[in-house]
């Protein structure tokens, strides 16, 4: 049946799409040229040029759109619409590549684009996306293989999925699809569906497809790189600001998390987020366990963290960013609280997994509230939840983010950003844990110091042994005037002559420990510092008594040794005339340093502290015990009731503490050999001054030289037992040796090491020889130089020489005995050998050979 011209015209007017497609195909330059007469070739060529101009204009328009528009969807939409026309495809679609929970997928961004479509109709909103995992559908296969695919008949393609057709009531016949790549990474997949003017897409269509997709690829690359740049910028800002708040708040994990999360809220790109903090208790208290053991309560059967803790959220912090910003803190949240009711935070705390949920209301595993949470009408759409893990790989909390601001589900870049934040905050827990440990250690230290002070400090009854104010005045020392205390002390103290505290030959052997305390108090009065520096007399008594108690009850380095060193310092200053170089304040500090120089000594040396890995060795790098003695002395002086420096001004106090630092550290014999040459130069320098007064004036102003002399004085005081009269020195030497042998026993039993001869009890007989070596190698230089420096100190050097003679005589006597024993031993060995030979001859054994004859 033929159609009239009017009917054809009417049909074409009523079907513009068909007309456009039909004439677009029939009126190509080639077809028109073939239908034209020869005379029209020039005009037909002009028609071809006109089509090329139109094509160039279209390409120019695309380039212009790419340059002017930052909207990726708009540019790609125009490209797809143009492709539909050129390829004669029924429709085109754009699928964006993304990852969630570590699984790649493709989601529709532009769907069913036709030549006359509008962007608004084709742009897929986030809640209407069609999502293809990479193992489903042809687009998934394209993303996996990263190659263009031309499917001529989908019925014969094993990768085809009718999932989208069923959703849209559409029938797909053939497909041309290609990936958009950024290097080796897939960015998107573009697909053309159903060839209109043929059974399938041809190779020419593939070429055209590729040509136009160069523009799409460029645009999508720019979009992808821009998105990655934006994500990295946000990530950098998140880490920067969270670090700022983490290091600003080191004391409390809750405050640290809150400050960090609140500060970075603008960079998280979500409408709301909550942080659930987990109880870190691993073991229950006994009173919580008893009801379970008694059958009165059911044992916990709920989920646990990977390290075995019960999952208990003790606090939830809810950050609301949509509408009016708000923060809600929920201590001890109930199980049905909206942030916990879904079960997602509990699951994350149990498994440690990152969970990215695209459609919360349709999720079958977790029970999210479908309706609005509050009066604002806010609804949960998509969720990203992840654990906050500390450096010990313990889950300390769970952070959950709701509803990405642009409506799209959270992608892999969001996961990376949020994970960076939670990971950083998890590691920063180490700061608060360390602070908490330090705080506890500080508290324990304070408690330990208080306990030590309780046992060391002179109590109210002990002070009455020196200051009997109850018997004399009927009241406590604190209630007495200074003059009253001074009168009592004047009567109770022994005076300077009773125990010869001004003499180098002073011996403590005839004194009780309490008498030594009284002698120590007397030395301060003799120095004239009590009145000058306004030392409270009760404080002075308490200080000396407490120092005596702070020395341990060990063999040698006890209170008696501490007092002897202070007395020798006092004698060097007063009798040895070294006080002329020092002020009263400096003499005050030097005697105090002598009293404290070995306080709390353990009876073992520095080397043993290191070998036994004593905490002191870890606390102090060098001069281990000396630094401990110094710290202990300062600790006592820090107590107001013992602080004899309490009335010094700031500059005076700093000066005496500085001198104590030098004086006590100088008792380390390892430092003695470093300062010997410097001290000798000072002594030699003093001999260049004929006028002693000029030398005193010079040295008094030379701070460094005075400190070197003081340091050498401390060494002379520490070794002064070697300069006592022989009857005293011989006894003290045995005490020193006994303490050394005790350390040797510890090295042998505890450290399983062989001690050096000086500390070996089995070589006790070699003590005289060791003493001679010690005098020659260490002691002689000190006292020889001091006797050159001040002739008043010569008695110390003379007694040292005398003691050396005594030890040398004992050493020679021991050597003679050893030699005699060796000779006797050799004779005995010779007798045994001769007897053995005679026995062999009598028994018919071989006779000795003669050098002059031979017996046949």
Curated annotation (Swiss-Prot):
Disulfide bonds: none annotated. SMART domains: GAF, HDc. PROSITE patterns: PDEASE_I_1, PDEASE_I_2. Residues 71-220, 252-429 form the GAF domain. It is linked to Defects in Pde6b are the cause of the retinal degeneration (rd) allele, which is characterized by retinal degeneration. The retinal degeneration 1 (rd1) allele also contains a cofounding mutation in the Gpr179 gene. Belongs to the cyclic nucleotide phosphodiesterase family. This is Rod cGMP-specific 3',5'-cyclic phosphodiesterase subunit beta. It comes from Mus musculus. The lineage of its organism: Eukaryota, Metazoa, Chordata, Craniata, Vertebrata.
């Amino acid at each position: 049946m033929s159609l009239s011209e009017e009917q054809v015209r009417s049909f074409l007017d009523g079907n513009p799409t068909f007309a456009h497609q039909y004439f677009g195909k029939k009126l190509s330059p080639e077809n028109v040229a073939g239908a034209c007469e020869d005379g029209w070739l020039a005009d037909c060529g002009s028609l071809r040029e006109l089509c090329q101009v139109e094509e160039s204009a279209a390409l120019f328009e695309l380039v212009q759109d790419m340059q002017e528009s930052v909207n990726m969807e708009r540019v790609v939409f125009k490209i797809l619409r143009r492709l539909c026309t050129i390829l004669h495809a029924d429709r085109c679609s754009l699928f964006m590549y993304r990852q969630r929970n570590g699984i790649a997928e493709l989601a529709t961004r532009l769907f069913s684009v036709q030549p006359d479509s509008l962007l608004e109709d084709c742009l897929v909103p986030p809640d209407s996306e069609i999502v293809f995992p990479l193992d489903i559908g042809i687009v998934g296969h394209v993303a996996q293989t990263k190659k263009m695919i031309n499917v001529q008949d989908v019925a014969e393609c094993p990768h085809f999925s009718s999932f989208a057709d069923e959703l849209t009531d559409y029938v797909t016949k053939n497909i041309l699809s290609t990936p958009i790549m950024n290097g080796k990474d897939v960015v998107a997949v573009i697909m053309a569906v159903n060839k209109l003017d043929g059974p399938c897409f041809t190779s020419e269509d593939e070429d055209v497809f590729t040509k136009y997709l160069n523009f799409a690829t460029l645009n999508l690359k720019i979009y992808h790189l821009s998105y990655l740049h934006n994500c990295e910028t946000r990530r950098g800002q998140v880490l920067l600001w969270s670090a700022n708040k983490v290091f600003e708040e080191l004391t409390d994990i809750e405050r640290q998390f809150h400050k960090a999360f609140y500060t970075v809220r603008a960079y998280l790109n979500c409408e709301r987020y909550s942080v659930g903090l987990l109880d870190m208790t691993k073991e229950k208290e006994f009173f919580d366990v008893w009801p379970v053991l008694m059958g009165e309560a059911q044992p916990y059967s709920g989920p646990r963290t990977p390290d075995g803790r019960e999952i208990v959220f003790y606090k939830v912090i809810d950050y609301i960013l949509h509408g009016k910003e708000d923060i809600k803190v929920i201590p001890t949240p109930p199980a049905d609280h909206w942030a916990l009711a879904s079960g997602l935070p509990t699951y994350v705390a149990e498994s440690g997994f990152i969970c990215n949920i695209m459609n919360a209301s349709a999720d079958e595993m977790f029970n999210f509230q479908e309706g609005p949470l509050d009066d604002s009408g806010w609804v949960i759409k998509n969720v990203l939840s992840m654990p906050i893990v500390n450096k010990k790989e313990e889950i300390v909390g769970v952070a959950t983010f709701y509803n990405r601001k642009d409506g799209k589900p959270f992608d892999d870049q969001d996961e990376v950003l949020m994970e960076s934040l939670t990971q950083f905050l998890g590691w920063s827990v180490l700061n608060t844990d360390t602070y908490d440990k330090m705080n506890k250690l500080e508290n324990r230290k304070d408690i330990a110091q208080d306990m030590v002070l309780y046992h060391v400090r002179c109590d109210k009854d002990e002070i009455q042994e020196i200051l009997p104010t109850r018997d004399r005045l009927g009241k406590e020392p604190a209630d007495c005037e200074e003059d009253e205390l001074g009168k009592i002390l004047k009567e109770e103290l022994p005076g300077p002559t009773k125990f010869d505290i001004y003499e180098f030959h002073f011996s403590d052997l005839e004194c009780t420990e309490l008498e030594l305390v009284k002698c120590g108090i007397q030395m301060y009065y003799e120095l004239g510092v009590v009145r000058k520096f306004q030392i409270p007399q009760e404080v002075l008594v308490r200080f000396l008594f407490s120092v005596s108690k702070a020395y341990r009850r060990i063999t040698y380095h006890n209170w008696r040794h501490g007092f002897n060193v202070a007395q020798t310092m006092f004698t060097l200053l007063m009798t040895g005339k070294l006080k002329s170089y020092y002020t009263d304040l400096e003499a005050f500090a030097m005697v105090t340093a002598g009293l404290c120089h070995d306080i709390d000594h353990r009876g073992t040396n520095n080397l043993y502290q290191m070998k036994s890995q004593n905490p002191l060795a870890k606390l102090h790098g060098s001069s281990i015990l000396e630094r401990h003695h110094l710290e202990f002395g300062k600790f006592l002086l820090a107590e107001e009731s013992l602080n004899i420096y309490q009335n010094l001004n700031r500059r005076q106090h700093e000066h005496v503490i500085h001198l104590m630092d030098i004086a006590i550290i100088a008792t380390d014999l390892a430092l003695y050999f470093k300062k010997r040459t410097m001290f000798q130069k000072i002594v030699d320098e003093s001999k260049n001054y004929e006028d002693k007064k000029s030398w005193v004036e010079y040295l008094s102003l030379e701070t460094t030289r005075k400190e070197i002399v003081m340091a050498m004085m401390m060494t002379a005081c520490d070794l002064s037992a070697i300069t006592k009269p022989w009857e005293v020195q011989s006894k003290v030497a045995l005490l020193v040796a006994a303490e050394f042998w005790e350390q040797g026993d510890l090295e042998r039993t505890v450290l399983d090491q062989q001690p050096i001869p000086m500390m070996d009890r089995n070589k006790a007989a070699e003590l005289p020889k060791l003493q001679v070596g010690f005098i020659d190698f260490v002691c002689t230089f000190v006292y020889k130089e001091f006797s050159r420096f001040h002739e008043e100190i010569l008695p110390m050097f003379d007694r040292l020489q005398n003691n050396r003679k005594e030890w040398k005589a004992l050493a020679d006597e021991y050597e003679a005995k050893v030699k005699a024993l060796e000779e006797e031993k050799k004779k005995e060995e010779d007798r045994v050998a001769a007897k053995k030979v005679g026995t062999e001859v009598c028994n018919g054994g071989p006779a000795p050979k003669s050098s002059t004859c031979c017996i046949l």
